[in-house]
Structures are given as structure tokens and as C-alpha cells.
């Protein structure tokens, strides 16, 4: 709980230093457990701060109850529950303080200074409890005033309900008058409906007369349509004969176009195959050249490594011979340092050579990849050119087909 943390904070070191009594000259009487209790529950460590400051209360100007009447009762109950909790917490705190003081009095029996401090602490805590009770009574009075205000709000709502009932009665009277007006308008509409029915019967008679006249006209039209159908059949037979002639010409032209298209596709296929063979030959040559270069570089690197190993062996032999000649320990240590230095230099040189080798290999890989990219780009460009050629030829063939279709349509119309 927050109040317990505030109580722990209130026990400042300055207050403890002021209230700490002077130590006696000799050791305290009693067993070791009693002395530990004295150290635990000594009144010098306990706080003399007023504990009423630990509980926060709302100002009198601030209202506990909200403006909405539905939630007033629940908030008042919450407020009263909070007050009960604070009272219970304060009582528990007072009992704890009593127990601490009784333990201190039992541990410090026979020392007047500690007894006086314990009495002072009791007085301070009694004062704090009385002040807290006063504040709680003030808060209860405030809550009672707010309950009265809530009752006044309830009376206001009752008056508002009465006004609404009066307005409702007035609205019901207006609705009754409107219903009477609606009945009169319904009677007028029924008279209008009878008049419309009479007019509808007259219109039906005129429609039947019109139907009889239309039947005679339709018979005349049927005879004329039969004559036109006979003429259309004769003209259609003539057009069918003309279409057969045109279809024969169209098939002959289509065969010629197919022959041209097949010849062009064969030529393009042959060109594609030749180009692929050339590119494959170029790739094989380029790979062989790159492999020969890589083999040469590796041979040179191996020769260099062999030479460096031989030089290292010769130097190590010379150094070993020199070390055998030396007898003094100081010279031996100096030679060892030189050997280590030379070994470090050689390792650095070896690492540099390895880096150079890897750099050359990476360059060769980059060149190899760039060659492949250029060949791939050239192949893509050739494929695009061939696609454009095929599209142009298809466009020409479609144009020729459209022309033939137009000719056929003209012949059919003629």
C-alpha cells in the first residue's frame, strides 16, 4: 500500500539522530534475543512525523458526486468504502505502534530516557489518530451535504417528468384531430376512385375498336411480307453463287501467303541456329583463354611460394647454426627474438602474397562475368530483332487478310 511506503519515507535520518538517546555506560541487561529486540524496536528509529499527512483528502470546494444521476449512488458507495478502508488501515497501524512500544518498553525496562521517548511517541500517535478522526467526520459531513444535493436533483427530474407527461397529452390531442382530417380526405379519395373507374371503362371500349382495325391492317402487311420473302430468296441464291467464286480466290491467296510465311520462318530459324553456334564457339574460346590464364597465374604463384619456402629453410638453417655456436644465454635470447621477428615478417609477406593471389583471382572472375554478360546482352538483342521482324510480317499478313475481307464484303453487298 502507498501509506506504508509513506510511513517508511517519513522516518528520516535527521529525526532519528535527534531522538536517539545517549548510550549507557555499561551493557544492557537481559539476553541476546532481548537486545536484538531493543535494536529492532528502539524508539529512536521510529518516526515522530504526523501521520495525518499520509492520507490525501479532496478539498471541500470539489464535489464528490458527478452531474449524471445514474452513477451518483455507486460513486458515493465507493467513497464510503475508501473511508472505511483508511479507518481500518489507521487502526491496524495504531495497534502495530502499540505492539512496537510495548516491545520497546519490555526491552528497555529500567531506563528512564527510553521510557520518556516511548511516552512521547504514544502521545504523538494519539494526537495523529484524533486528527484523522476529525478529518473523517468532516468528510462524512461533506458526503451528507452531497446526498442532499442529489435529492434536490431527483426532485428536479420528477418535475421534468411531469412536464413531459403534460406535453405528451397535448400531442395525443393533436394526433386525434389529424386522424379526423385523414378520415375526411379518405372519403374524398373514394369519390375520385369511382369517377376514375367510369373513365377506365370508356377507354377499354375505344381500345377494342382500335384492336379490330389493327387486325385488318396486319393481314394486309402479312401478304406484302410474303411477297418480299420470295424476292429475298431469289437474291440470296444469286449471292451464294457469287460467294463460292470469291471463296475459291480467297483460298488461293491464303495458300500463297502461307507458303511465303513458312519460307520466312525457315530462314529466321536457320539464322538463329547459326548465331547460336557462333556464340557457343566464342564462349568456348573465351573459357579456354581464361583457364589458360588461371593456370599460368597458379603456376607462377606456386613457383613464388616454393622459392619463399626454400629461402625460409635456408635462413632457418643459418640461424640454427648460429644458435649452436652461441654459448651465452643472453646472446641466445637475442637470437630467439630475431628469429621471432623474421618469422613475423615472413608471415606478413605470406599473407600479402595470398591477398595478391586472391585479388588477381577476383579480377579474373570479374572479367569472366563481364564477358558472359556481354554475350548474353548480344543474344537478347538478336532475339528482340527477330521478334520485331516476326511482328512486322504478322502485321503485313493481317493487312492483306483485312483487304481480302473487305473485297469479299463488297462483293456480297454488290
UniProtKB/Swiss-Prot annotation:
- Kindly indicate whether the keyword Ligase belongs to this entry: no
Range of residues in the leader sequence: none
Which regions form coiled coils?
A: 70-94, 121-149, 188-223, 266-414
Any idea what this protein is called?
Protein FAM81B
Chain segments carrying region Disordered? 1-43
Which ranges are annotated Polar residues under compositional bias?
1-13
Q: Which family does it belong to?
A: Belongs to the FAM81 family.
Which keywords belong to this entry?
A: Coiled coil
Q: From which source organism is this entry?
A: Bos taurus
Amino acid at each position: 500500500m502507498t501509506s506504508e511506503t509513506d510511513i517508511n519515507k517519513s522516518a528520516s535520518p535527521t529525526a532519528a539522530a535527534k531522538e536517539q538517546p545517549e548510550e549507557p555506560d555499561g551493557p544492557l541487561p537481559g539476553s541476546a534475543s532481548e537486545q536484538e529486540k531493543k535494536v529492532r524496536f528502539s524508539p529512536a528509529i521510529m518516526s515522530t512525523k504526523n501521520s495525518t499527512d499520509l492520507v490525501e483528502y479532496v478539498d471541500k470546494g470539489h464535489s464528490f458526486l458527478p452531474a449524471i444521476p445514474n452513477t451518483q449512488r455507486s460513486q458515493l458507495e465507493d467513497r464510503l468504502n475508501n473511508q472505511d478502508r483508511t479507518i481500518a488501515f489507521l487502526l491496524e497501524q495504531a495497534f502495530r505502534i502499540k505492539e512496537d512500544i510495548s516491545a520497546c518498553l519490555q526491552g528497555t525496562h529500567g531506563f528512564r530516557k527510553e521510557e520518556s521517548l516511548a511516552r512521547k511517541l504514544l502521545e504523538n500517535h494519539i494526537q495523529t489518530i484524533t486528527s484523522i478522526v476529525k478529518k473523517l467526520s468532516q468528510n462524512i459531513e461533506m458526503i451528507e451535504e452531497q446526498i442532499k444535493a442529489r435529492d434536490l436533483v431527483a426532485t428536479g427530474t420528477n418535475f421534468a417528468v411531469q412536464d413531459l407527461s403534460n406535453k405528451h397529452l397535448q400531442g395525443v390531442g393533436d394526433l386525434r384531430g389529424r386522424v379526423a382530417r385523414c378520415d375526411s380526405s379518405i372519403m374524398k379519395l373514394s369519390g375520385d376512385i369511382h369517377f376514375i373507374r367510369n373513365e377506365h371503362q370508356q377507354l377499354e371500349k375505344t381500345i377494342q375498336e382500335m384492336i379490330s382495325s389493327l387486325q385488318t391492317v396486319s393481314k394486309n402487311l402479312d401478304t406484302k411480307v410474303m411477297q418480299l420473302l420470295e424476292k429475298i430468296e431469289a437474291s440470296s441464291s444469286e449471292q451464294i453463287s457469287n460467294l463460292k467464286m470469291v471463296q475459291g480466290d480467297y483460298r488461293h491467296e491464303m495458300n500463297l501467303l502461307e507458303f511465303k510465311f513458312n519460307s520466312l520462318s525457315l530462314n529466321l530459324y536457320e539464322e538463329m541456329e547459326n548465331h547460336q553456334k557462333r556464340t557457343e564457339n566464342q564462349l568456348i574460346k573465351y573459357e579456354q583463354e581464361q583457364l589458360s590464364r588461371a593456370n599460368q597465374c597458379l603456376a607462377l604463384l606456386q613457383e613464388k611460394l616454393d622459392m619463399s619456402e626454400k629461402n625460409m629453410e635456408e635462413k632457418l638453417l643459418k640461424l640454427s647454426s648460429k644458435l649452436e655456436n652461441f654459448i651465452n644465454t643472453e646472446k641466445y635470447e637475442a637470437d630467439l627474438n630475431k628469429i621471432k621477428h623474421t618469422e613475423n615478417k615472413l608471415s606478413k609477406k605470406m599473407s600479402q602474397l595470398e591477398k595478391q593471389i586472391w585479388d588477381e583471382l577476383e579480377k579474373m572472375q570479374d572479367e569472366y562475368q563481364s564477358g558472359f554478360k556481354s554475350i548474353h546482352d548480344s543474344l537478347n538483342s538478336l532475339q528482340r530483332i527477330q521478334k520485331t521482324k516476326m511482328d512486322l510480317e504478322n502485321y503485313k499478313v493481317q493487312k492483306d487478310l483485312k483487304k481480302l475481307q473487305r473485297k469479299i464484303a463488297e462483293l456480297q453487298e454488290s
